[in-house]
From Swiss-Prot:
Bilayer topology annotation: Peripheral membrane protein
GO cellular component: plasma membrane
Residue stretches spanning the membrane: none
Catalytic activity: phosphate(out) + ATP + H2O = ADP + 2 phosphate(in) + H(+)
Gene from which the chain derives: pstB
Annotated protein name in UniProt: Phosphate import ATP-binding protein PstB
Organism for this UniProt entry: Bradyrhizobium diazoefficiens (strain JCM 10833 / BCRC 13528 / IAM 13628 / NBRC 14792 / USDA 110)
Entry similarity comment: Belongs to the ABC transporter superfamily. Phosphate importer (TC 3.A.1.7) family.
ATP-binding listed as a keyword: yes
Function summary: Part of the ABC transporter complex PstSACB involved in phosphate import. Responsible for energy coupling to the transport system.
């Protein structure tokens, strides 16, 4: 989705991304349930993330959208007492398989968090660090990979003359794009974005949104956002969640113009949430 042609929806005047044909499934979710101890946080979730498509997850705080995102790369394994049941497939790989190598899973399914999290090291090493975890390559190959990753993060032209500067010296927007470049560097298949622009100014937000659209040419993307305009601008599909349930999942254009469920309509028009 490299170009964004927009029309205005009847539901709040939101700009709409163009409708694309259905894509082959990259991630398939069937009857997924998730528990924090005895608390049933997600209930019978069923959806599909299309290959090289952007799927937005919207809903009020606490509805389960960020929880769902973290199941896609098993981040919940870091916390005792949390468990998922059901089926969650990445192509032919069962993400919920207890024997799955989580390091390899997280190379295939990368994640960009709400707050930029650059490592306390140089810009170059921020990118090279992850590559070294999975590959042994020459210095010249590493230089090439670092450049490609920074270009993929739309950051190369801004940092090419200061690769030895600390990643922490960059602005907030640049730090977030560095984190995106770091994720791209290990060549994932899926990239998860959890409120990636919530801490950024409007100019930096626009750059990240444009970057997400460019990345969708090569990656399958899932993004959690509270910003309805952002969901409408960048996504092909939108999932509306409420109280741990998936209420509606459809083309973004339909969700924002003629949702099937009244709760979806009420949320996107600001009646609650």
């Amino acid at each position: 989705m490299s170009e964004l042609s927009v029309s205005m929806s009847a539901a709040g005047g939101l700009p709409q991304a163009p409708l694309l044909p259905e894509a082959p499934a990259k991630v398939t979710v069937r009857n997924l349930n998730f528990y924090y101890g005895e608390h049933h946080a997600l209930k019978n979730i069923n959806l599909t993330l299309g290959t090289n498509r952007v799927t937005a997850f919207i809903g009020p705080s606490g509805c389960g959208k960020s929880t769902l995102l973290r199941i896609f790369n098993r981040m919940y394994d870091l916390y005792p007492g949390q468990r998922a049941t059901g089926q969650l497939m990445l192509d032919q790989t069962n993400i919920l398989d207890g024997k799955l190598d989580l390091n390899l899973l997280r190379a295939r399914v990368g994640m960009v968090f709400q707050k930029p999290t650059p490592f306390p090291m140089t810009i170059y090493e921020n990118i090279a660090f992850g590559i070294r975890l999975y590959e042994k390559i020459s210095k010249s190959e590493m230089d090439d990979r670092v450049e490609k990753a920074l270009r993929g993060g739309a950051l190369w032209n801004e940092v090419k003359d200061k690769l030895n500067a600390s990643g922490l010296s960059l602005s907030g927007g640049q730090q977030q794009r560095l984190c995106i470049a770091r994720t791209v560097a290990v060549r994932p298949e899926v990239i998860l974005f959890d409120e990636p622009c919530s801490a950024l100014d409007p100019i930096s937000t626009a750059k990240v949104e444009e970057l997400i659209q460019e990345l969708s040419e090569n990656y399958t993307i899932a993004i959690v956002t509270h910003n309805m305009q952002q969901a409408a601008r960048v996504s092909d599909k939108t999932a509306f969640m409420y109280l741990g349930e998936l209420i509606e999942f459809d083309d973004t254009s339909k969700i924002f113009t003629s949702p099937s469920d009244r709760r979806t309509q009420d949320y996107i028009t600001g009646r609650f949430g």
